[in-house]
């Protein structure tokens, strides 16, 4: 492939990702294909978002790291010291992607570190490694462009998470605001008793203890269920099994109790 063809292939990652869930594995595969190197996309906290290996490394520690999808904390923190692309780092470097305990097997191993930056903050790191042949200027151009594309997708994913969190919170607030005073009181007692995200409720017992009618409890649960905040299932004489579907619900309920 020519440099132009390789650049277009990276550009296609961005076009294909539009409107879809971000697939960092596919991105890593593409970068491995065009740069011909092992590719690891690592978040700022060391989570392995995606990887692809042109040359699998036979090392138990590396295999475990890939299985757990987590880079060591010390190594992840050290990457923050790399503020710009650092290329062709030898196996003796603290940033090497090769296992240092087997350094004698990878004496010609070379690593390139590309910081992933977006929105003025460090989002992660693109780590490339291969044996023998140096990373050329063309490779580094592709790596930095690839890092930019990955950074854009990380920002996109973060924006979606923020939007989803805002939606979840808004749904909960609307559901709670639809409750009458007595229904809200009933809900507070119900989840005090459940003491968690799910459990068995006997409505009549709570009604008797708190001094409210059973219908108030039923209406309150129905409103929350119709809003998609909880799921409830009747178990007959045993009571009603309740499960919280929206993680923001218990947080908002706790805020109300503390006000």
Curated annotation (Swiss-Prot):
Name recorded for this polypeptide: Global transcriptional regulator CodY
Any one of the GO CC terms: protein-DNA complex
Domain of life: Bacteria
Family designation: Belongs to the CodY family.
GO BP annotations listed: regulation of DNA-templated transcription
UniProt region (GAF domain), positions on chain: 1-155
Record SUPFAM superfamilies: Winged helix' DNA-binding domain (SSF46785)
rRNA processing keyword on record: no
Compartment list: Cytoplasm
Protein encoded by which gene: codY
Predominant place of localization: cytoplasm
One Pfam family recorded for the sequence: HTH_CodY
Keywords for the protein's UniProt record, in alphabetical order: Cytoplasm, DNA-binding, Repressor, Transcription, Transcription regulation
DNA-binding region ranges: 203-222
Function: DNA-binding global transcriptional regulator which is involved in the adaptive response to starvation and acts by directly or indirectly controlling the expression of numerous genes in response to nutrient availability. During rapid exponential growth, CodY is highly active and represses genes whose products allow adaptation to nutrient depletion.
Taxonomic source organism: Listeria monocytogenes serovar 1/2a (strain ATCC BAA-679 / EGD-e)
A molecular-function term among this protein's GO annotations: DNA-binding transcription repressor activity
